[in-house]
Curated annotation (Swiss-Prot):
GO terms for biological process: regulation of DNA-templated transcription. It comes from Ruminiclostridium cellulolyticum (strain ATCC 35319 / DSM 5812 / JCM 6584 / H10). This is Probable transcriptional regulatory protein Ccel_0181. It comes from the Bacteria. GO terms for cellular component: cytosol. PANTHER family: TRANSCRIPTIONAL REGULATORY PROTEIN YEBC-RELATED (PTHR12532:SF6), TRANSLATIONAL ACTIVATOR OF CYTOCHROME C OXIDASE 1 (PTHR12532). It is found in: Cytoplasm.
Length: 248
């Protein structure tokens, strides 16, 4: 267990923005729409849709909502035409930030992002300015409980093709190559495991610690503001938060 990603330390805990379930489901519905448009409405033949559905389930999206989103995407009745686009920038203290967005208006999205980066002491950069500081990996997180045996889970994950396995006080973390993510996730799902997280993510190769109280405050507000934007699906960053900062 190398622990190279330290997911629990670098991924912001689901905060006030993600507490609004309707907002999460709206964002996931957009991801479903794009997946259906790219590969059809049948998850058995559309691996992207299958992965999005797994992400929906990890976020406790009811199956009825998932199926309605797929049907709506198949019909394209509302005329919306969403696309996926990634923006990059720097937060306070040079923290690298990546925002994965699903939008029907690039200008609106870029304007909203720029506003918050500027407001909280960062700046929106050019494409590629920070992405080289991250590795794209599949991430599966399983809660620790009496039903899960750590050694068994580790062996089953590695046998299915996982690259790495780690754990902390609360959960187990499984890292995969993006190409192997679906295979590993499906193998563990078939064995009855339930996931807290199950998605392809961006993991920083190095992290940045902030010591200035104002920078810490602004960085926290920046992430919260970005996550709260309807167009933003995922926010990744290189900020290594102390436990006391995560709890605030």
């Amino acid at each position: 267990m190398s622990g190279h990603s330290k997911w629990a330390n670098i991924k912001r805990q689901k905060g006030a923005a993600d507490a609004v379930r309707g907002k999460i489901f709206t964002k996931l519905g957009r991801e479903i729409q794009i997946a259906v448009r790219m590969g059809g409405a049948d998850p058995s033949s559309n691996s992207k849709l299958k992965d999005v559905i797994a992400k929906c389930k990890a976020n406790n999206m009811p199956n009825d909502n998932i199926q309605r989103s797929i049907k709506r995407a198949s019909g394209e009745t509302d005329g919306s035409n969403y696309e996926e686009i990634t923006y990059e920038g720097y937060g306070p203290g040079g923290v690298a930030v990546i925002c994965e967005c699903t939008t029907d208006n690039r200008n609106r999205t870029a304007g909203d992002l720029r506003h918050y980066f500027d407001k909280f002491g960062g700046n929106l950069g050019q494409s590629g300015c920070v992405s080289y500081m991250f590795n794209k990996k599949g991430v599966i997180v399983i809660e620790k409980n009496d039903k899960v045996n750590e050694e068994t889970l580790m062996m089953e994950a590695l046998d299915a093709g996982a690259e790495d396995f780690d754990s902390d006080d609360n959960c187990y973390e499984i890292i995969t190559d993006p190409a192997d993510f679906s295979t590993v996730r499906e193998a563990l799902e078939a064995k009855g495991y339930e996931f807290i997280e199950a998605e392809v993510s961006m993991i920083p190769t190095t992290t940045t610690k902030l010591t200035d109280p104002e920078q810490i405050k602004f960085m926290d507000k920046l992430i919260e503001a970005l996550e709260d934007l309807d167009d933003v699906s995922n926010v990744y960053h290189s900020w290594e938060q102390d436990e006391e900062n995560e709890e605030e």
